[in-house]
Every structure is written in structure tokens, then in C-alpha cells.
Amino acid sequence: MPPNLTGYWRFVSQDNMDNYLRALDLNVALRKLVXLLKFDKEIVHEGNHMTIRTLXTXRNYXI
């Protein structure tokens, strides 16, 4: 059984994100766009099932 990570996980910082994206060879425009995104996570455990929601300004994802 996985550890219980239930909660709301707020994005804090992107230290060295630009250097990381540059190493991945992303162009300048895409790097600037990624630097503006702030993703938060909401994790819910229900028995053996885990739901992870990624919350962003433009779009939300559920896994």
C-alpha cells in the first residue's frame, strides 16, 4: 500500500527551472511560458485508490 499523501500540495518555487529547460534544449519562448505556470496538486486516498488532480491556471487534470 502506498504512503498516504492526502492533501493539497501548493507549488512553491522554480529554482533553476530555466537552466533545466535550457539543458533539455527548449526554445526561449517555451521556457518563458513554462516559467509562468504554477501547478498545484490535490491528492485523495480512498482505500486502495488514489486520485491526483493537477490544478493550473489554464487547465486542470485528474489521474
Curated annotation (Swiss-Prot):
What GO molecular functions are on record for this protein? retinal binding; retinol binding
Transport in keyword set: yes
Alphabetical keyword list: Retinol-binding, Transport, Vitamin A
Q: Does the keyword Transport apply?
A: yes
Question: What role does it play?
Answer: Binds vitamin A2 in the eye lens and thus functions as a UV filter. Intracellular transport of retinol.
Q: What's written under domain?
A: Forms a beta-barrel structure that accommodates hydrophobic ligands in its interior.
Q: Which family does it belong to?
A: Belongs to the calycin superfamily. Fatty-acid binding protein (FABP) family.
Q: Which PANTHER family does the record cross-reference, listed alphabetically?
A: FATTY ACID BINDING PROTEIN (PTHR11955)
Q: Which protein are we looking at? A: Iota-crystallin
* Organism in which the protein naturally occurs: Gonatodes vittatus
Upper taxonomic lineage:
Eukaryota, Metazoa, Chordata, Craniata, Vertebrata
